[in-house]
Amino acid sequence: LVFDEYDAGRPDVMFVIQRVLETEGQLTLLDQNMVIRPHPAFRLFATTNTVGLGDTSGLYHGTQQINQGQMDRWNIVVTLNYLSHDDETAIIISKVPDFDTKQGREEVSAMVNLADMSREGFINGDLSTVMSPRTVLSWAQNTLIFDDRDLAFKLSFMNKCDETEHGVIVEYYQRCFGVDLLSDGTETSQGSNFAG
């Protein structure tokens, strides 16, 4: 069983889960006078963005700090980082197969490069919004819909960002595609809009 976005759970619900987290834990359904005991192979997982600490950054509004007693019942806590560049590129191409050409693969690789830059910028405090693999996928899909990579980028990511950070974002874009998003859209030799 996977509790997705576990730290967004309501505290009254979280206490019901606490008993299940115990070794050989069980769930009691009082209204049905029933006790549910898990199969020996049963495993419980949870995903969070805050590692149970609540929204300390302002990025995950609606999350709750998880009770320390409940956190203590989780035997293993793992932090997952972003995918490798090649893995993320392969996933985007598998989801948007129109990009599975030489030019398309180069285009997606540059998109992922920009996403990597945004993540580094976020870590360094230059950006307050990070580009997730989901955003890169939206950008690729919107590039096909609008037949315009630059517009698709603005609609998929840049418009979500603080305007005071647009200069940094425009610089990242120029590095990856050779296009100044604030100009008339004329490209340098590095970039081109994807054309099927």
What are these model-derived regions, one by one?
Residues 1-196:
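C-terminal regulatory/interaction module of P-loop NTP-utilizing enzymes
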